[in-house]
Amino acid sequence: MQREVGPQVAPPMFLHQIQPLPPHATAAKKRGNPWPAAAVAAAEAKGGGNWNPRMWDWDSRALTAKPSSDALRVNAGLSHHQQQQQQSPPAAAKAAEALRQGGGGSGGLNLQLGLREDAATPMDVSPAATTVSSSPSPPASSAPAQEPVVRPSKRVRSGSPGSASGGGGGGGGGGNSGGGGGSYPMCQVDDCRADLTNAKDYHRRHKVCEIHGKTTKALVGNQMQRFCQQCSRFHPLSEFDEGKRSCRRRLAGHNRRRRKTQPTDVASQLLLPGNQENAANRTQDIVNLITVIARLQGSNVGKLPSIPPIPDKDNLVQIISKINSINNGNSASKSPPSEAVDLNASHSQQQDSVQRTTNGFEKQTNGLDKQTNGFDKQADGFDKQAVPSTMDLLAVLSTALATSNPDSNTSQSQGSSDSSGNNKSKSQSTEPANVVNSHEKSIRVFSATRKNDALERSPEMYKQPDQETPPYLSLRLFGSTEEDVPCKMDTANKYLSSESSNPLDERSPSSSPPVTHKFFPIRSVDEDARIADYGEDIATVEVSTSRAWRAPPLELFKDSERPIENGSPPNPAYQSCYTSTSCSDHSPSTSNSDGQDRTGRIIFKLFGKEPSTIPGNLRGEIVNWLKHSPNEMEGYIRPGCLVLSMYLSMPAIAWDELEENLLQRVNTLVQGSDLDFWRKGRFLVRTDAQLVSYKDGATRLSKSWRTWNTPELTFVSPIAVVGGRKTSLILKGRNLTIPGTQIHCTSTGKYISKEVLCSAYPGTIYDDSGVETFDLPGEPHLILGRYFIEVENRFRGNSFPVIIANSSVCQELRSLEAELEGSQFVDGSSDDQAHDARRLKPKDEVLHFLNELGWLFQKAAASTSAEKSDSSGLDLMYFSTARFRYLLLFSSERDWCSLTKTLLEILAKRSLASDELSQETLEMLSEIHLLNRAVKRKSSHMARLLVQFVVVCPDDSKLYPFLPNVAGPGGLTPLHLAASIEDAVDIVDALTDDPQQIGLSCWHSALDDDGQSPETYAKLRNNNAYNELVAQKLVDRKNNQVTIMVGKEEIHMDQSGNVGEKNKSAIQALQIRSCNQCAILDAGLLRRPMHSRGLLARPYIHSMLAIAAVCVCVCVFMRALLRFNSGRSFKWERLDFGTI
């Protein structure tokens, strides 16, 4: 009132009138006194990014932040200090009451209450911002430093558990809001009874926990059912197709709706705000008319309460007549000479329209008024005819739209109305997209953009606030096929090469991919030198976007099975990734990367945010944003405003789709969220190859952000550390000594960081052989799990996994370091190298194995630490059997007995969760034939481990999953394979040494398809030693004795009394259980002592005498003079030649 009366009085009195205002500001400052002034000033200067990680406990799996014990103690002290302060003045009390009551509104209010005169931004009192804590609230500027209570994930609807009589606009939790006084909302699955008091509003409303909402099978009402993602209720399994998350009925309806237009966003764009009363009524009539038509043809009737009611045909005719009367003076010169409707808009008319239109809304309405010649002609037709049919009316409106849409779209694509006429005419001559095609399909309007025009002028950002009406009307009045879906996002960029003389280059949007330009071409050195920072002014490919845009890429419409989520149906190749196996039965290292889940990282840097501003349903929003593709997901936060690193395991096709359409996906994230966490402020999103920035409705895609000085880890040693021990890691990679580089390590939801010291020699800063060290603290409670080692410099870098396990498993995993250190990373800037990277190389295969093993160890550690049967069993249950199969094959092929045993123990724990999982696990183990593989490799240690592995069931019964008589292909058992292999005595010994002695019993009785036993196989291949070994074991078992081979002699140990009392008592005292122990101990106990007999022992004397006798005889014969009766005497010395 004072500001309205002020101009009527003298200036001194006006200044005197506003004197009562300062007490309000003083009261606000007095309320802010209990908070540390330095902390508040620092928070305002830093934009909320100077928060202390020790004050928050972060759940890396649920993506929720809670105040730590230190924060609770600090808040308790502050609350006690606040109670001793003076009560706030009445004006401030009224303001606080207004804040509390403002949360009950439907959309929230932006109020400037005068508490701070210097505050330029209005105070947000929307339900998401009016969080009430247990203690009196500080001023809004210091609110982030305070612990909030659980806020609702969405506005609570009537009838939901969160809207029960709890009062006050609800915190979303509701406590016992599900029913009566002492009850609480619980999951409807049999034997679950999960408390949904603190669960999301969606889960409380539908009475299903998060786990059973995603599982493929659940027992509900003594019947196996599955939760439908679209119906939000359970259906029998017979109503679902294999691999589908929605029932067939809803999928069929989705397929029908998919072929129609989606006018939801168009209708929301066309609505004029209620406070814009200065706009002309004719513009309101045009917009409302087209809005009604959009509502008639869509499936969203009743979803938008602000849309006017549907009039009958008489009212529509009256509106058109009104428009005709307004433009009667101008319609004669612009109407076509023929009374028939001309669906082809002339080029000259479009050119004039382009010259007259601008980006502002007022000039756009003028363009709409000048393009109503179709309405004028048809209005005359209405006077001549009787009541026209509905199809005739829709034809008239489509004609008018055909003549009005090119202006708006062209204005949108051009970005400015002062372009030269030469460029416009040239653009129209080379782009026939504005002309309706000759096949009489539905009208399509696309923007025309010249290549040179787009390259010469600098990019411009088109910002569309929520309160403004977009200056374009991308509306189709008739149903169309998939080919007719326009993609407005790509139009300006797709036709940059439209001047090409090759007709194949000028493809229509219906046959072109969503983004045809190359965001990351091969860069020169000069380009890399220019792009040295990721700052806000970096050269970017700026695409015109607004919050109202929801048009998904064209290629995504080809899927007819998965439900539409956030306005974008997923790619059809997703389902094949879910059902595909991770590796081959014979060679796991030759599997294709497309059939495996890839582990990657998405980083969000949120400016001006801190953990208190993170919504409670952040995990659900990210999962919905990624179209439920992630199989695994973890997140870690650290200061620097708020840096959220998301590690996800998704199919390779999902990663590729995200990289190709990151700009559009970020728009979907902002528009699909109901919270201001994404909509307001500024944030960056980084994947492995792209960077997108968002600020106040404008989205940018970085043209090239990876530079030649980007730090990159190529090797970490050791790759496996013992849990609970302090370890020093050696990091190798590129550009690790650049100033500003930091090393981070994820640990139990927090980060351990280290600043890299700059190299003393400037010439060695940018090199490919940097070496750094990083010390791990060795947390005692962390026995099994995984670290992620990250390097970062200016929001660029990569990560490397490190496994946490026991010493024996770490020793086996460290054998992979040779494979990792010997190979190099693939440079993704080259197309050829990127194509070759599609085939997993040895290093990629090792990293994939470490990532998968890390996900499993994380789940196993969580289940072990929690010691909750329900949560732990269900947690491991979602680690698929196919992924277990891959890990078992990879480990067993390398003869890692310790790791294989650990994996089998975790698998056994998982299989005990349900009978179906047990059956599925046994089928998987029977398919991969681990024992057969060990026999072929002649791995006696692995074979002995497998045949002796036992699973103890809940009823104390024992199950041996690896039996030596299990028949494989052709009826061959592991015994047959061992009998046919040479030098496999140890393998036969291990197979016939199983606890149940099945191997001994089946050596003669197990037959293959040809009726041959293992004994026969051994005889045919002259492996008689195997039969002798088995026969000796059978005799020993029959006689209750043990046979030990010492050299080539057999020593029989009769356990019934054949051995001396001394030896017998010694053996019984040692309780020999293993044949190896028997051989070692009994060889020392039973070997007779050999007394030294010197050199005159009898065997030596006999040999020496024999040799001496032979030597004497030879010498006598050779030296004697021989005489013969005939001939002269013979002497050996004169022997030359002659006869004897």
UniProtKB/Swiss-Prot annotation:
Assigned keywords, A-Z: DNA-binding, Metal-binding, Nucleus, Transcription, Transcription regulation, Zinc, Zinc-finger
Annotated positions binding Zn(2+) 1: C187, C192, C209, H212
Chain intervals with Gly residues compositional bias: 164-177
Domain of life: Eukaryota
Compositionally biased tracts (Basic and acidic residues): 450-466
Gene Ontology terms: cellular component: nucleus
InterPro entries: SBP-like (IPR044817), SBP_dom (IPR004333), SBP_sf (IPR036893)
Transmembrane segments: none
Domains (record comment): The SBP-type zinc finger is required for the binding to DNA.
Name this polypeptide is given: Squamosa promoter-binding-like protein 15
Upper lineage: Eukaryota, Viridiplantae, Streptophyta, Embryophyta, Tracheophyta
Gene: SPL15
